[in-house]
Amino acid sequence: IDGNEAVAQVVYQINEVIAIYPITPSSPMAEWADAWASEGKPNIWGTVPTVVQMQSEGGVAGAVHGALQTGSLTTTFTASQGLLLMIPNMYKIAGELTPTVFHIAARSLAAQALSIFGDHSDVMATRGTGFAMLCAASVQEAHDFALISTRTTLESRIPFLHFFDGFRTSHEINKIELLTTENLQTFIPNELVIAHRSRAFTPDNSFTRGTGQNPDVYFQGEEGTVIYYIACQASLKSMDEFAQMTGRQYQLFEYHGDSTAERVIVLMGSGCETVHETVDYLNTLGEKVGVIKVRLYHPFDSQRFIAALPPTTRSIAVLDRTKEPGASGEPLYLDVVAALYEAGEQLPKVVGGRYGLSSKEFTPGMVKAVFDNLAATIPKNHFTIGINDDVSHTSLDYDPDFNI
């Protein structure tokens, strides 16, 4: 089973309205949902989800927003420019504290050129919308997080982007442990669904939403959502409940490596798998290295991130699968730097780098080069890995023949 089908199998069964407009590499998720609806396949409540194809991703976002206002459990799948067209509605959905999950096969954006391949450029463009962001690193995680994100959005009322790497994960065929219908029914309590229904616009439950506000109250309204984002981090305790149900334990920030590691790489997405295996190999050679896999990117829980770091950490490399021209650093790097600075403790050296844009290969040799850079007296910051940058000279040298 590939990543797209693994996600679609869960999503179809726990939603009532699925608005679609196909875009590579997320299209198979929409195709699966459409096919199952045509066959009359029911969800866990015994009804056949309504799958509707709109005229564009902008139309999809409007349809999702509207369906959510009726109390329907609603979702969509998209990527890249399609996700960008949804941003205006995403601000409204998040601002109105409306539970939903958008499932994203993360893909490059068309900038200096178009590319259909995977990186995190699209999801990072939505950081200001107010959506929480949960990242899966494998087909199994994508399958599981499709359920965990839905449970958490219903509990917290914070909408979610559940994303995984386009092609590298969305089209990877792997053997996984599938969630059963009983698992889904157990993990989505009826009281959460009823609570979502109770906020629907109906003649019997009339109230005002989406008003125009003036300076006397708008600021207060914006700040009033803070408690929901704090609660959202706590809501992911459902990961522990998921572990009891399936035996698969996930953490918001998962550390893997030597317990006394001095050099640590921080990243999210499919690259975590490569770093994980390379860390194991390097530690057998006597190195003291580790990796932190970021699952919940937004809202970023600084305290849990600090707690996940080994106390022996002396240097950190934060790897982003995106580029933000003109910024002082890439998104994950900036969040990590802020978390460490605000902790007020002895700060390890932190450098940031870019890798894997447009599905550029990310190999064990590249991981070793990043760790070697961290061992330098003055590590290179804002580096690239995986290319030969003979223009701005940001790239790290690596051994293409290194293998594990």
UniProtKB/Swiss-Prot annotation:
Catalytic activity: oxidized [flavodoxin] + pyruvate + CoA + 2 H(+) = reduced [flavodoxin] + acetyl-CoA + CO2
UniProt keywords, alphabetically: 4Fe-4S, Electron transport, Iron, Iron-sulfur, Metal-binding, Nitrogen fixation, Oxidoreductase, Repeat, Transport
UniProt record, GO biological process: nitrogen fixation; response to oxidative stress
Keyword Transport: yes
Gene3D superfamilies: 3.40.50.920, 3.40.50.970
A molecular-function term among this protein's GO annotations: pyruvate-flavodoxin oxidoreductase activity
SUPFAM superfamilies attached to this UniProt entry: Thiamin diphosphate-binding fold (THDP-binding), TK C-terminal domain-like
Pfam families: PFOR_II, POR_N
InterPro entries, alphabetized: PFOR_II, Pyruvate:ferred/Flavod_OxRd, Pyrv_Fd/Flavodoxin_OxRdtase_N, THDP-binding, Transketo_C/PFOR_II
CDD domains named in the record: TPP_PYR_PFOR_IOR-alpha_like
Enzyme Commission no: 1.2.7.-
Record-stated family: Belongs to the pyruvate:ferredoxin/flavodoxin oxidoreductase family.
Job description of the protein: Oxidoreductase required for the transfer of electrons from pyruvate to flavodoxin, which reduces nitrogenase.
Identification of the protein by name: Pyruvate-flavodoxin oxidoreductase
Origin organism lineage: Bacteria, Bacillati, Cyanobacteriota, Cyanophyceae, Nostocales
